[in-house]
A protein has these predicted regions:
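N-terminal targeting signals for export/organelle localization
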Residues: 2-5, 10, 18-79
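C-terminal cap of thioredoxin/glutaredoxin-like
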Residues: 4-5, 27-42, 62, 183-256
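Extracytoplasmic/secreted proteins, especially bacterial periplasmic and envelope-associated proteins
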Residues: 36, 40, 47, 51-54, ...
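A short beta-strand-turn-helix
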Residues: 80-98
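Structural alpha/beta surface segment adjacent to cysteine/selenocysteine redox centers
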Residues: 101, 112-186, 216-221, 252, ...
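Short pre-active-site segment immediately N-terminal to redox-active cysteine/selenocysteine motifs
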Residues: 104-107, 222
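Solvent-exposed coil/turn segments that connect beta secondary-structure elements
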Residues: 105-106, 135-136, 231, 238
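The canonical Cys-X-X-Cys-His
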Residues: 108-112, 225-227
Length: 256
């Protein structure tokens, strides 16, 4: 039996497990009538498994809609932290009419690929505000790299040095950790004495705690993840999909 067949069979079984007891509880049916209805229902579903598939598709659609509404409520409740926290890096137009928030991990392969998408949006869209949030979910090395990134942000109010650091570390090969992150920071000419001091400050821990708290509220557990307007986008969906979300947020349709 193929995986598809197994899936349909399991769905049929689950449907019948729910439906048959309900039929059995119908007092107006005789025992013989109940048995006949059960047989007809079972035979129909086995003969037409696409009904189960359609039902599953509709269930997925409703679940997606429910998730979207939940995300909208969560984003509204946490809007200040998501879009305007003083503990975040802002690139592009700080007064942009759409804010594009990315949660990333320096050891995330998909984030490495998605970086070009963010950079293209940054270059091509003068009305876009881009917010970067460190979200180190891939182990100790990721946490160390994120901590250094926060310290970089603390001595760079313009975001220019942070972006340079971000591109070099995320775009580099191999595992990102404290040693590599510090090497990149030194290479781009940052004040290393201040960086080490900032790295030991409470601000670094507070920043990452804030990022994790809002990510948890949004139900995020992987990277890259995005908040665009009142929408959550999970995964490296590609430049065109991100553009469509930005345009929909800006003017209500995929193409402005």
């Amino acid at each position: 039996m193929t995986f598809r067949s197994c899936l349909v069979a399991a769905a049929c079984s689950a449907f019948l497990a729910i439906a048959i007891p309900q039929i059995s509880q119908a007092d107006e049916l005789t025992a013989g009538q109940k048995s006949e209805v059960e047989r007809i229902l079972r035979d129909y579903l086995i003969a037409h498994p696409e009904v189960i598939q359609d039902a599953m598709a509709e269930l997925d659609k409703r679940q997606s809609a429910a998730d979207a509404e939940k995300h909208k409520a969560t984003i509204k409740q946490n809007a200040q932290t998501i879009f305007s926290s003083p503990r975040q890096v802002v690139l592009g137009n700080p007064d942009g009419n759409v804010t594009f928030v990315e949660f990333f991990d320096y050891n995330c392969g998909y984030c490495k690929r998605a970086m070009d998408d963010m950079l293209t949006l940054l270059k091509d869209d003068p009305k876009l505000k881009i917010v970067l949030k460190e979200f180190p979910v891939l182990g100790p090395g990721s946490v160390e790299a994120a901590q250094v990134a926060v310290a970089v942000r603390m001595q760079d109010k313009t975001g220019k040095k942070y972006l340079e650091f971000h591109q070099k570390l995320l775009g580099g090969r191999g595992q990102a950790d404290k040693a590599r992150a510090l090497a990149v920071a030194k290479d781009i000419g940052l004040d290393m004495t201040r960086l080490e001091k900032d790295l030991a400050s409470a601000e670094v821990k507070a920043t990452l705690q804030e990022n994790f708290k809002v990510a948890e509220a949004l139900g995020l557990n992987g990277t890259p993840s995005y908040v665009i307007g009142d929408n959550v986008v999970v995964g490296a969906v590609g430049l065109e999909a991100l553009k469509e979300k930005v345009n929909t947020t800006r003017c209500g349709k995929p193409t402005c």
